[in-house]
A protein has these predicted regions:
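Short aromatic/hydrophobic "clamp" motif used to bind/position activated sugar donors
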Residues: 100
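Cell-envelope/extracellular polymer assembly enzymes that use nucleotide-activated donors
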Residues: 11-14, 42, 202
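N-proximal low-complexity "stem/linker" segments adjacent to membrane-targeting elements
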Residues: 1-35
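Acidic donor-binding/catalytic loop of UDP-sugar-dependent glycosyltransferases
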Residues: 53, 86, 107-125
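Conserved nucleotide-sugar donor-binding catalytic segment
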Residues: 140, 154-240
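Glycine-rich, basic loop-to-helix element that forms the pyrophosphate-binding segment
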Residues: 77-95
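A conserved acidic beta->alpha catalytic loop
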Residues: 39, 47-56
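Short beta-strand-to-loop element that shapes/binds the nucleotide-sugar donor at the catalytic cleft/hinge
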Residues: 138-150
Length: 274
C-alpha cells in the first residue's frame, strides 16, 4: 500500500507582498520570509512598476535563494496597476499556495518558525474534523513596529480565541497581516475596488461568512504572526477609512448593530477622533 508523502500533505503558503517604490522597506520583509524554516513557501511580489531600487532588492533575494539550504519559490511581477487592491487581486489570481497571506513592505513574519506554527495548527484542525476539510482561515496575533523595525507593542485590538465573522462587529480584531485565507475562497471573494482604504476589512468578513455558511473551520494558530508597520494606508487616511468601515459594517451587520457598536466605540474612546 502506497503511503502519502507527509511533506506533500503540508499546506503551501503564498506570501504576497505588494510594492511600489518600497526600496527603503522591502528588505525587512524579504529577510523575514527568507528566514522561514518551512519549505513550502511561495513569495509573490507584485510590484507597481517601481522606479527606485525595489526590484534590485528582489533580484538579490532571488540570487540568494538559489543558493539557500531551504529554497522558496520567488515570483516577481512588475507592471502598472490601478492601486493597492487591484494589485492584491492580481496576487490572488497568481497565487499557487493553498493559503495566502498579505505582508506589506515593511511588515515582517515574527520568527523563523512562524509558518511552521501556522501549518501545524492547520493540519491539527484538518485531522480533527470528520471529513478532514481544510480550514477556511488561520489567524494569529501581531505586534506593531516603527520604521526602524523596533517593536512598539501589541495592537489595541486583540484577536479572540475563537474567531467568527461576527467578531468584526467589534472592529478588525485580527490584523490583515495575520489572516491566512484559503486561496480557493480568496478567489471567490476578490477585494472590492469600491473601497479605497478598507477593502481588507470587508474581504475578511466575506471569507469568514462563507466559512460559517459551509461549516469550515477558522483556526487560531496561537502565535504572533507578523510585525506590522504602524504606518499604512488606513493610518494615513484615518477619517476616510472610518467612513468606509461604517459602510462595510452596515452592509454586513445592519444599521442597528452598526450604530450601537459605534456608540460603544465613542464611549470607550472619547478622545479618539472618528
Amino acid at each position: 500500500m502506497e503511503h502519502p508523502d507527509p511533506v506533500a500533505a503540508q499546506p503551501k503558503f503564498t506570501i504576497a507582498t505588494v510594492t511600489y517604490n518600497a526600496a527603503a522597506l522591502i528588505e525587512r520583509t524579504i529577510q523575514s520570509v527568507e528566514a522561514q524554516n518551512y519549505s513550502a513557501v511561495e513569495h509573490l511580489i507584485v510590484d507597481g512598476n517601481s522606479h527606485d531600487d525595489t526590484l534590485a532588492h528582489v533580484h538579490h533575494y532571488q540570487e540568494r535563494n538559489s543558493r539557500a539550504a531551504i529554497r522558496h519559490e520567488i515570483v516577481c511581477c512588475s507592471e502598472p496597476d490601478e492601486g493597492l487592491y487591484d494589485a492584491m487581486n492580481k496576487a490572488i489570481n497568481m497565487a499557487t499556495g493553498q493559503y495566502i497571506l498579505f505582508l506589506n513592505a515593511g511588515d515582517a513574519l515574527a520568527t523563523p518558525d512562524t509558518l511552521e506554527c501556522v501549518a501545524q495548527a492547520i493540519m491539527k484542525a484538518r485531522h480533527s474534523s470528520r471529513q478532514e476539510v481544510w480550514p477556511a482561515v488561520a489567524y494569529g496575533d501581531t505586534l506593531l513596529v516603527d520604521n526602524a523595525g523596533s517593536v512598539l507593542g501589541p495592537r489595541r485590538l486583540r484577536p479572540p480565541h475563537h474567531l467568527t465573522w461576527r467578531s468584526f462587529k467589534n472592529g478588525m480584531l485580527v490584523c490583515h497581516q495575520a489572516f491566512f485565507a484559503n486561496t480557493t475562497l480568496a478567489r471567490l471573494y476578490h477585494y472590492d475596488s469600491r473601497y479605497r482604504y478598507s477593502a481588507d476589512f470587508d474581504w475578511c468578513i466575506r471569507i469568514m461568512r462563507h466559512a460559517a455558511r459551509h461549516h469550515l473551520p477558522i483556526v487560531n494558530a496561537e502565535c504572533v504572526i507578523a510585525h506590522y508597520l504602524n504606518e499604512g494606508l488606513t493610518t494615513r487616511h484615518h477619517k476616510a477609512s472610518l467612513k468606509e468601515r461604517f459602510r462595510i459594517m452596515v452592509r454586513h451587520y445592519g444599521w442597528v448593530t452598526t450604530l450601537f457598536k459605534h456608540a460603544q466605540f465613542a464611549l470607550r474612546n472619547p478622545k479618539r477622533k472618528l
